[in-house]
């Protein structure tokens, strides 16, 4: 009897150290294999949510056009220096009428003197509201900005950011300066109708996503996509409509971004402000170029702002037919530029 008990005890001995280490190693390998798959699945879900959010914006823009027979414009005047954005104009069509009621459209979104503009106190209530449908869940940056008003110095007022930018020009020639009519659907005081989109709604971009700024200023080593370089005078600025103004080369664009004297992390810091820095984007280059965006002086509307995202390989975009597509970083540059124009008569057969 005792002998059988000893045999049973011998048969029930625990794991040896070697066996335990093998099991741990196997579990570690399984986790290592599964974790990237889980991360990819989560990013795919976030990218889908991003596309759905952008689709809501597109539907709102089209509903605005359907009701008013004109696409929403970007309000601006020389005295205001900053009008209301497309994103502000479509609030009633985004089921955000309660936020829209907080905006006093008889007053500008900003007040102060040129070069020293601040959020108009009358608009502070609306500007502090977060609109989830204007954000990409993959971005990961804090959308609440308390550091900035307009010129880079803040006084604690809360602004809420925006990832989805209105396409304000192809960026070719002088078509990056939205203070004047550009070749896109949106620019300052635009009144574009469907009849003016001769390229076709399925060949014309309305929105592209971009990354939020990182809330920080610096004079060197900028974070690409998160900080915008201040480059002073940009090629073609102030010459809108003049013939013969050529587009800057990619090398020049790189020099604008990498050779700036200072950088600000306020890209997309407010969905309310109708300025390229905050709510506009160009199609001059494919998504996610490897150098920083660049802007002119703080009192100007122009700059080279590109589509960017935290998604792998590209960025989401919204066409004027209401469809949302993912545009790869490797898309042909001329095709992407053509998608930014409403009446350029270009061949964009390569977007599929």
List where the protein language model places each region.
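N-terminal single-pass transmembrane signal-anchor helix
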Residues: 12-46, 56
């Amino acid at each position: 009897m005792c002998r059988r008990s000893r045999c049973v005890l011998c048969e029930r001995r625990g794991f040896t150290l070697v066996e335990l280490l093998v099991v741990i190693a196997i579990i570690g390998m399984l986790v290592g294999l599964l974790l990237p798959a889980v991360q990819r699945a989560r990013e795919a879900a976030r990218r889908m949510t991003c596309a759905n959010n952008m689709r809501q914006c597109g539907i709102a823009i089209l509903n605005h056009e359907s009701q008013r027979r004109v696409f929403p414009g970007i309000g601006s005047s020389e005295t205001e220096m900053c009008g209301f954005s497309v994103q502000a104009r479509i609030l009633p069509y985004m089921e955000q009428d309660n936020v829209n009621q907080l905006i006093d459209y008889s007053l500008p979104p900003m007040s102060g003197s040129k070069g020293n503009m601040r959020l108009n106190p009358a608009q502070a209530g609306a500007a502090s509201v977060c609109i989830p449908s204007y954000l990409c869940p993959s971005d990961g940056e804090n959308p609440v900005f308390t550091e900035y008003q307009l010129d880079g110095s803040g006084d604690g007022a809360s602004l809420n950011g925006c990832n989805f930018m209105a396409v304000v020009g192809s960026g070719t020639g002088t078509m990056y300066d939205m203070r004047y009519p550009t070749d896109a659907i949106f620019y300052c005081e635009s009144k574009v109708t469907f009849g003016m989109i001769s390229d076709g709604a399925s060949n014309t971009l309305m929105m592209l996503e971009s990354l939020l700024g990182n809330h920080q200023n610096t004079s060197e080593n900028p974070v690409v996509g998160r900080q915008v370089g201040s480059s002073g005078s940009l090629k073609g600025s102030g010459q809108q409509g003049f013939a013969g103004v050529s587009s800057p080369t990619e090398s020049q664009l790189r020099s604008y971004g990498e050779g700036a004297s200072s950088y600000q992390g306020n890209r997309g810091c407010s969905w309310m402000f109708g300025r390229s820095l905050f709510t506009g984007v160009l199609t001059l280059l494919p998504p996610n170029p490897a150098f920083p965006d660049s802007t002119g002086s703080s009192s100007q509307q122009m700059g080279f702002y590109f589509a960017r995202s935290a998604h792998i390989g590209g960025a989401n975009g919204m066409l004027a037919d209401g469809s949302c597509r993912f545009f790869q970083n490797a898309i042909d540059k001329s095709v992407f530029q053509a998608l930014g124009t409403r009446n350029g008569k270009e061949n964009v057969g390569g977007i599929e």
